[in-house]
Amino acid sequence: MKVHVRKNDTVVVISGKDKGKTGEVLRVIPKTGKVVVKGVNLVKKHQKPNRQNMQGGIIEMEAAINSSKVMLFCEKCKKATRISHKLLENGAKVRVCKKCGETF
């Protein structure tokens, strides 16, 4: 499944319980079409004590959300935006903001 965002992109959640939150993409899972966004879709995991974490307990971590629920955030126009692809003279393919024309 094709995903329109990449790791380290800043995105805005456009639907669901975390609607309106902004965060950085930590991980992209193209096989399922999901992304993990920092500070979004937090779930509690019950961690057993092990060698790395002797204490154990309940930890909060980010869970994956569908990539269709996020939009790329443009730093120039400060809005969530769609993207288009543009071919440069040197043959490089870049992502461009549909609202202001800024390249990502």
UniProtKB/Swiss-Prot annotation:
Transmembrane segments: none annotated. It holds the Pfam family ribosomal_L24. Keywords: Ribonucleoprotein, Ribosomal protein, RNA-binding, rRNA-binding. GO terms for molecular function: rRNA binding; structural constituent of ribosome. GO terms for cellular component: ribonucleoprotein complex; ribosome. The keyword Ion transport does not apply. NCBIfam families: rplX_bact. This is Large ribosomal subunit protein uL24. The gene is rplX.
